[in-house]
């Protein structure tokens, strides 16, 4: 009898555990263009591809860009007009989109002119909380177009960071607990090159100092010139 109860307990426990596991979604980003860093308005523009690979019943592509200011477009990056996911040999479903938009970033200039910045693009799925859906980084999921150059900046690479975003609020719905969502952040590392500091800051200062010293060394017969 005890063995029967034990087996029944196991049978009930296993489905519960399987149901408790959130559906994982492998996510990757390929940055095409980055431009118009506006430190006064704390914003930047980005153009990139984002893809999703998953197994399960939930379609994870109904995403929200948490720090988006303007989203110009979100187009499925296929040419056959079919909006259904692609079935991979691994048994996973696959979708890829191309995104263009303007995003918020709070620029810190404490280390100007040798400042460094970590721009980020954050996504969440507002339809499914973290206990149902979880975004994870795909293998080699953070990439930058190898011909992408930004004048006045050095590209220091990119990475994907995931976490659970706990809002600490049920947003006015008394029947819901505090909302927690899987948050995926694509981070782009930028730094001003040393040449910017030398050419834009030190060189003009050095020229002014040379002119000032040269004026002091003028012969007294050129006093009028020195005074000027």
Language model segments and positions:
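Bacterial Sec-dependent signal peptides at the C-terminal "C-region" and cleavage site
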Residues: 13-23
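Channel- or pocket-lining gating/hinge segments that regulate access to a cavity or pore
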Residues: 185-228
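Bacterial N-terminal signal peptides
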Residues: 5-15
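Soluble non-transmembrane domains of integral membrane proteins
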Residues: 21-185, 189
């Amino acid at each position: 009898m005890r063995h029967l109860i034990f087996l029944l307990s196991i049978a009930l426990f296993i489905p519960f555990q399987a149901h408790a596991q959130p559906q994982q979604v492998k996510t990757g980003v390929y940055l095409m263009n980055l431009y118009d860093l506006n430190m006064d308005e704390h914003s930047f523009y980005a153009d990139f591809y984002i893809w999703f690979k998953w197994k399960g019943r939930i379609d994870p592509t109904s995403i929200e860009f948490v720090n988006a200011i303007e989203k110009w477009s979100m187009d499925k990056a296929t040419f056959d007009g079919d909006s259904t996911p692609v079935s991979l040999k691994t048994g996973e479903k696959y979708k890829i989109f191309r995104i263009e938009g303007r995003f918020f970033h709070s620029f810190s200039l404490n280390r100007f002119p040798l400042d460094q910045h970590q721009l980020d693009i954050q996504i969440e799925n507002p339809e499914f909380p973290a206990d149902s859906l979880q975004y994870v980084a795909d293998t080699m999921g953070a990439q930058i177009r190898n011909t992408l150059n930004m004048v006045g900046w050095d590209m220091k690479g990119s990475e994907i960071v995931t976490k659970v975003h706990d809002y600490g609020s049920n947003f006015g719905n008394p029947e819901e607990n505090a909302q927690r969502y899987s948050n995926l952040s694509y981070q782009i590392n930028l730094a001003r090159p040393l040449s910017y500091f030398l050419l834009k800051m030190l060189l003009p200062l050095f020229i002014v100092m040379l002119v000032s010293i040269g004026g002091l060394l003028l012969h007294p017969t050129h006093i009028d010139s020195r005074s000027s």
